[in-house]
C-alpha cells in the first residue's frame, strides 16, 4: 500500500477489508491497534466472531455487514477467500452467507475514484471477486504477490545471517 500511494502515511488511507474473519482480518485488526489504521471490516454477522473478540477490549474496530457502507469512498479494498483451507466442508454454507459480499465493479465504483484492489491469492473468481475486478486497472494483486517474494527472501536472509 505504501509503495502504491507513494509512501503516503497509512493512517491517512481508508481501507475496507471485506470477507471472512480469519488470519488476514485478524492481522489487520492488530494493525489498527498498533498503527492506528482506518479500516472498515465487512462480513456477515455470523462470521465476525474473532473480530468482535479482539474489539471487546480494544473498541476501535469498525465492523459492519453492509458492503456499500464499508466501501464508500475507501482508498483500498482488500478481500480473501470465503472458505479457508481446512473449512472445505463449510463451503456451500459460506457461499450462501457471503454471496452479497463479492467485490464487483459496483463495489469498486462505490469507492474512491483511484481505489486499489488487493487479494492475498489464490482468488476464487466468481466468488469473493469478479474476473473484471481481478484483472482491472484497480487491481494490484500481481505487485502484491511479487512483494511477498521479496519479504520472504528478506526474512530467510535475516534468519540465516543471525
List the predicted regions and their residue ranges.
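Structural/interface elements that position substrates and couple domains in central-metabolism enzymes
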Residues: 1-162
Amino acid at each position: 500500500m505504501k509503495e502504491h500511494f507513494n509512501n503516503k502515511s497509512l493512517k491517512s488511507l481508508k481501507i475496507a477489508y471485506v470477507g471472512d474473519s480469519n488470519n488476514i482480518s485478524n492481522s489487520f485488526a492488530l494493525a489498527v491497534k498498533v498503527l492506528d489504521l482506518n479500516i472498515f471490516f465487512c462480513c456477515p454477522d455470523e462470521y465476525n466472531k474473532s473480530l468482535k473478540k479482539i474489539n471487546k477490549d480494544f473498541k476501535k474496530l469498525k465492523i459492519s455487514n453492509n458492503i456499500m457502507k464499508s466501501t464508500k469512498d475507501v482508498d483500498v479494498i482488500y478481500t480473501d477467500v470465503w472458505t479457508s483451507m481446512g473449512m472445505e466442508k463449510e463451503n456451500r454454507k459460506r457461499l450462501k452467507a457471503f454471496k452479497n459480499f463479492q467485490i464487483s465493479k459496483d463495489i469498486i465504483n462505490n469507492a474512491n475514484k483511484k481505489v486499489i484492489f488487493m487479494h492475498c491469492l489464490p482468488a476464487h473468481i466468481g466468488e469473493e471477486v469478479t474476473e473484471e475486478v481481478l484483472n482491472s486497472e484497480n487491481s494490484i494483486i500481481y505487485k502484491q504477490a511479487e512483494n511477498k517474494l521479496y519479504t520472504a527472501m528478506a526474512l530467510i536472509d535475516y534468519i540465516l545471517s543471525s
